[in-house]
Amino acid sequence: RQMCIRDSTYTIEDIYALPEGERAELIDGQIYYMAPPSRKHQRISTRLTSIIDRYIEDHQGQCQVYAAPFAVYLDESTNTYVEPDISVICDPNKLNDKGCNGAPDWIIEIVSPASKRMDYYTKLFKYRTAGVKEYWIVDPDKSRIIVYNFEQSTMDEYSFTDSVKAGIYNDLLIDFNVLSF
């Protein structure tokens, strides 16, 4: 159900005016409705958010992790609003009651059939140009994780049997093999 609804340009105000419970993202003035996530999607999101949060706590880190729904305004424009599945923000000045103003340091998107094109193409470009440092695409259907480290200009692919190192941290290794989804 992820589809664009018209050719004219929408703004953040149109997102705020959506009926209660209706989830959508705004990218370059186009509204994309979001299908409800599957159980497996939510399980992956919960597990990864928990691991990252525990790591930050154990290391007295200043970063904060947020799971969707969490508003991210990538830039100063009023025509882009996204809700990444997982956002890690290390600059407290970017955070306010509405969400995050500016690019998170690390974003994880968990692919669903309806979000595939957005996660692999549209958001990849938006996140890179906005200044996100690291972007993970977790694809349950393909049992793979694609890790983009924009600061290093690298892209690596892993499977659900691998341990994956987070680029923004020196020693955070997430072992997908022991995670039960």
Predicted regions and their residues:
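Gly/Pro/Ser/Thr-rich low-complexity, intrinsically disordered segments predominantly at protein N-termini
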Residues: Q2, R6-F181
